[in-house]
Amino acid sequence: MIVLEDAEPFDEVRRDFAVEAVELGIPFHITLLFPFTPREQLTAGLLAELRAFFAARRGFEFELARVAEWPGVVYAVPEPDTALRDCMQALFLRFPQWPPYGGVHPEVIPHATLGEEVDAPSVRAEIERRLAGHLPRRYKVDAGTLLEEFARREWRVRERFPFAG
């Protein structure tokens, strides 16, 4: 994942509309590949592969430009998303045993979830109101992050993988 630092007021919105993710300790982010290997199957070799993968990539920038929705989900749209899509696709190709979102979605679209399991149209309007004046927000990406479920319903950062530069 790409952890999005300096996340206020996004975290305030998430506390109201993405309650479960916040309670689980999942930071504001853009998913690169999920699900990934279970914690008990995460080996030193696999971590080394991830380090090498991210170390071979260059950092990039994007803006969270606007708010959009899917049924039940409200999210911030990163633009441009080409570097994110390239990184996601390269991870998918490198680790085909873990298809993105279990292979449920034919196309994986980069996004930063702001609300889930919600009435998307009404929640989107409320989130847009609350984020007025805060979008677009520019982000510089210099690392990928591996999050792991270390206890039932508790997540934490396992490792941060710096990009080449």
What is the meaning of each model-derived region?
Residues L64:
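Portal/gating segments that form or line small-molecule/metal binding sites
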